[in-house]
């Protein structure tokens, strides 16, 4: 895949913090913490591309690679379930139509923000573009609560995804990394030692005083 294609998973970082996303995807900086390592373990269990299960009218594909030229993104779906029915996509070597449902596995429990939902919606848009079909729903599976959460792929979510990736592509093409703005989310960020948001905040205050004291 073209190196200039953005990663689907990046939308999670972008929702959490635009600077974090830029540090990872533009400046190629990364630090692991306990949560990121645990998250990688959860996904390793899903990304076995050779494992395809067939259960009656259900086809289960793991680690499926997807992309969208419209959004300029690529990535992997943890799981895509194809259910045979009267609508969906035509699959090579399979009879009939198969309706795809993306399933994303997540650490912990449902988040307060919509980052997981937007990532799932992006996967759905990619699958639609690749398979020439329509996807109305997908699922988020959280390991802490051990159940799926159904997500409706609405027009509002689709528009939000389009707008966010347009902004991300703009930042990426310009090589723009937003300035640090310290807030409560910074405490649990794996990049806080690279970002140094508190130092950036102090520096901006010092700059303010320097500018305002010069004329005194």
Question: Positions of the model-derived regions?
Answer:
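Short, charged low-complexity intrinsically disordered segments located at boundaries
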Residues: 42-45, 52-56, 150-158, 190-202
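Residue-level signal for secondary-structure boundary elements
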Residues: 22-23, 34-35, 169, 173-180
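Metal-dependent nuclease catalytic cores that hydrolyze phosphodiester bonds in DNA/RNA
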Residues: 1-102, 202, 209-216
